[in-house]
Amino acid sequence: MIRGIGTDIVYIPRILRILQKYGKKFLNKIYTEQEIEISRKYNSQEMQAKYLAKRFAAKEAFVKALGGFSHGIIMKDIEIYNDVRGKPHLTVSKNFIFKDHMIHLSLSDDGDCATAFVIICSSLP
């Protein structure tokens, strides 16, 4: 059963400007250590911004699927990672809330925009 659906779109140059202006302060507020470490592997700030923009969109889409931040979750509690085949996944550090739920995530980018779509499903009726 679908419990929530969320989508978000992010303007990548906006993330680049925020990254250039706030640097570590921005990264540490929004992203997990693993997300930050992976983002540093990109050779250019533009590619790093694209990577971060997709994760930002995914976190926003997930919060929208939840119905907002009312569950006590902050952006840094949400981690986006890719499996060995490249499929994106979303985990929440406060997993006790989602033990009976599956979270489906799709990420995409084209030109200056990154987008994410999240579906939260429950096996319970």
Swiss-Prot record:
Entries under InterPro entries matching the protein: 4-PPantetheinyl_Trfase_dom, 4-PPantetheinyl_Trfase_dom_sf, ACPS, Ppantetheine-prot_Trfase_dom
Pfam families linked to this entry: ACPS
Cofactor: Mg(2+)
Record-level GO BP terms: fatty acid biosynthetic process
Enzyme class: transferase
Compartmental location: Cytoplasm
Entry keyword NADP: no
Record-listed Mg(2+) binding positions: D8, E60
Source organism superkingdom: Bacteria
Keywords, ordered alphabetically: Cytoplasm, Fatty acid biosynthesis, Fatty acid metabolism, Lipid biosynthesis, Lipid metabolism, Magnesium, Metal-binding, Transferase
Gene3D superfamilies: 4'-phosphopantetheinyl transferase domain
Molecular functions per Gene Ontology: holo-[acyl-carrier-protein] synthase activity; magnesium ion binding
The protein's Enzyme Commission number: 2.7.8.7
Cellular component per GO, a single term: cytoplasm
Chemical reaction(s) catalysed: apo-[ACP] + CoA = holo-[ACP] + adenosine 3',5'-bisphosphate + H(+)
Function in brief: Transfers the 4'-phosphopantetheine moiety from coenzyme A to a Ser of acyl-carrier-protein.
Family classification: Belongs to the P-Pant transferase superfamily. AcpS family.
Matches recorded under HAMAP family: AcpS (MF_00101)
The protein's name in its UniProt record: Holo-[acyl-carrier-protein] synthase
Higher taxonomy: Bacteria, Pseudomonadati, Pseudomonadota, Alphaproteobacteria, Rickettsiales
Gene: acpS
